[in-house]
Amino acid sequence: DAEEIVAGKKTLLQISSENKLKLAAEFFYDEKIIRQFGTVSFLVSDLPLQDEEMLNKVLNIPELFYTVLTPKDESKKRLSQLSKAGKRYALLLDDNITELNFKLSSRYSDDKIKKSIKEIVGTFYNAVFFIIDDRSDLFESEKFPLIQSELLKRGIKLTLSSKLETLTSSKVNAEDKFQDFMLTVKKNDEKVLVVSANDYLTISELIPSYRKIGYKFIYPGDIIIKR
């Protein structure tokens, strides 16, 4: 049996066997020791919006994260649920927006673009920041400067998807991929990791272990907003 007693800057470790004390050691906290691990935050994508049970499992994970939504009615219907669960979100703009009231297209007139932006911002006004897929046709189009201008004048923070880390894995190796990622996080790093809801359910169980050894986990907004 092992017993750890913490008192101020001193820790007493006692190891016993068969009710006999085998080892007793004192450890003292050294204020000169500096944290050697970096900071990580999570953006959880691919929410199971049509699966109530799975969605609740994700929202009930007791860790710090934002969800990632795309402009569509299914996302709109879940906004109050996210709010009640105390979860905030970022909004992704890419080529996959299909619903006409939210759609952004290089073929649209400036007025139609402005109307769509107004609808998006009016519906998802609680988004902490917007993400633009900078590998999308939308980003490369001649309409993007207008989209960017309309967002910035509303005080919306816009970040590029390429500035974010992405955990690409299968269900089998999510833990291994996450552990590989954590090895890349150095002491001065502040990384935002995009991870699918399914994978986050798996890797969230590993987070407390990393926190114990010195890694810091915070909300993505604390990194993105100050950039």
What kind of region is each of these model predictions?
Residues 1-41:
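Non-catalytic propeptide/linker segments at domain boundaries
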Residues 27-102:
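Active-site beta->alpha N-cap acidic-glycine motif
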Residues 39-41, 64-68, 86-90, 126-131, ...:
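Structural preference for beta-strand elements that scaffold enzyme active sites
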Residues 43, 47, 100-109, 129-142, ...:
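Second-shell loop/turn segments in exported
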Residues 70, 92-118, 134-138, 145, ...:
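Long, folded non-catalytic interaction modules
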Residues 110-134, 180-194:
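CE4/NodB-like, metal-dependent polysaccharide N-deacetylase domain
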Residues 150-176, 217-227:
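His/Asp/Glu-enriched short active-site or ligand-binding loop at hydrolase and phosphoryl-transfer sites
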Residues 199-227:
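C-terminal domain-boundary segment and adjacent tail
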